[in-house]
Swiss-Prot record:
Interacts with ABI1. Part of a complex that contains SOS1, ABI1 and EPS8L2. Associates with F-actin. One of its GO terms (molecular function) is actin binding. It comes from Homo sapiens. The gene is EPS8L2. PROSITE patterns: PID, SH3. GO terms for cellular component: centrosome; cytosol; extracellular exosome; plasma membrane; protein-containing complex; ruffle membrane; stereocilium bundle; stereocilium tip. Residues 492-551 form the SH3 domain. CDD domains: PTB_EPS8 (cd01210), SAM_EPS8-like (cd09540), SH3_Eps8 (cd11764). Belongs to the EPS8 family. It is found in: Cytoplasm; Cell projection, Stereocilium. This is Epidermal growth factor receptor kinase substrate 8-like protein 2.
Amino acid sequence: MSQSGAVSCCPGATNGSLGRSDGVAKMSPKDLFEQRKKYSNSNVIMHETSQYHVQHLATFIMDKSEAITSVDDAIRKLVQLSSKEKIWTQEMLLQVNDQSLRLLDIESQEELEDFPLPTVQRSQTVLNQLRYPSVLLLVCQDSEQSKPDVHFFHCDEVEAELVHEDIESALADCRLGKKMRPQTLKGHQEKIRQRQSILPPPQGPAPIPFQHRGGDSPEAKNRVGPQVPLSEPGFRRRESQEEPRAVLAQKIEKETQILNCALDDIEWFVARLQKAAEAFKQLNQRKKGKKKGKKAPAEGVLTLRARPPSEGEFIDCFQKIKLAINLLAKLQKHIQNPSAAELVHFLFGPLDLIVNTCSGPDIARSVSCPLLSRDAVDFLRGHLVPKEMSLWESLGESWMRPRSEWPREPQVPLYVPKFHSGWEPPVDVLQEAPWEVEGLASAPIEEVSPVSRQSIRNSQKHSPTSEPTPPGDALPPVSSPHTHRGYQPTPAMAKYVKILYDFTARNANELSVLKDEVLEVLEDGRQWWKLRSRSGQAGYVPCNILGEARPEDAGAPFEQAGQKYWGPASPTHKLPPSFPGNKDELMQHMDEVNDELIRKISNIRAQPQRHFRVERSQPVSQPLTYESGPDEVRAWLEAKAFSPRIVENLGILTGPQLFSLNKEELKKVCGEEGVRVYSQLTMQKAFLEKQQSGSELEELMNKFHSMNQRRGEDS
């Protein structure tokens, strides 16, 4: 795996609103209020006490055994860790008063550390030397410490220079008996007030949305791609017997990116466990030499870092492991050197470690969503070694029973993961996945049985027209009215549901719906519900994307048959877009996705490349590094087939400037295409970090197995 899995929980991974296409990219008034409120609550100056929001990056002991004998050595080590993305940030508050520097827990306001000013030997800024551009350095040593500590903080809301000036003025007053700080605070107070009044900065006009080439364009035809099975499980249907090659390539790309992100988050979680264990070890070492009743140096910060993940975080990781297993089984024909069968063994290493960390399989057993597909279960049965098989069996039915054999009630909800990178997986790909649709009947046709005809007659009381019935399009559902999700309406009251995720119709019987729409229920079968939109269109929607809604949520009552309906109609049929580029661009993009997958999920050093089974010419990759200038950035953007508007907007930046932009900023500058820019930059960062270092996960697992061996020898 690449080092990107060890990326820290830092700002920039949060999701922002998309850039508006009709003018200026703006924050909503509520978002603006919340941002200003957070800023004003975290960064305040009152009387002789100032407070700043900071992120603790690292604490090093200045010790020859650690190869740190000076501040410069400590900075070099921090830069090295940053380049490998091995820094873990911890949000906290830094308070400065005329007696001490205090670190507070950002949530509980509990004091973590108290550094009396006489123990602060040095304050310094470290600017633009690592991925955190504004860093404050403190060297502290109390009378009981034989060696000083070097603390690093990222000043993400107020510049490090400003915090440094505040601390220096407090130190000068303490050492020299002067009164410089009141004047310093007065100037800083004005700067913070000005900053608060202008958040967020004004945005320029939003770019023109990226235009995809249509399916009939010459570039969209005759693409070479892998063969696809003529029939697949679930309600996936095609108008022709073979899916267009470019569409298949896009689907593989999306599934691969989901797999990348899932594996990144699994590695991130394992590395977090390692960091917590290291902090716990350091904490115990420091406690040994402290006096009774007195805190050891840096004890508060280490205690915070040593906290284990919550149960919810363990559940999230188990869900992503199940998702990764499903995707490995689905993509196994497209993965080689190493194969999916080889890679699953490296997935079970972290799984074993995580199960042991949370004291057994009980938490993992409780995780039913997502279920495994039939292919995933067969894949595991055919490839696990006895020890892995024993671990798998210990996790219970929710891990061993495929979706197709799972009881239909209660309904297992659609699983949409949230990734630490901020990348949002395409819901349509997840909706069609075998682990979501196996065992679900297809959308029903209208006239198939007397029961269905009776349902149609009942529904015609609500609908002005009946649906056309294409022959042989799907199988009938098992009718079970009023049994799903606890809806028990009275005969006189209409029933409504709220859409949880977008859904695109694939034939005339299904209905395309958008997230947060409220629709009227005409039929509520087990798996497919017939709904009617405000525009009067009726059709079937899978029940696992529906949530309960009240009639008042609709905003106004639905009109009776024969009257006009209001509101925009959802599209009834939408074909997937073609890949926006020519053949060479498609092949190059698939090469990059393929190469990135092997870097993310293989912790075998010096493995040969794995390839999709796609005929292609060898592309020339345009490099992008932290040393790239504007010309190289522009060439990289053009090589990635971004629109001219994006190339023009971002082509004036250097490599470090482009890499420093987070997802929210890219969305504001690039509109919807900013998500793709962010995704490509994330992949490029991972590639660069992989070149510099080996696998964090391999190192961790080696340590873990060594510990087990030593324990076995000791026993």
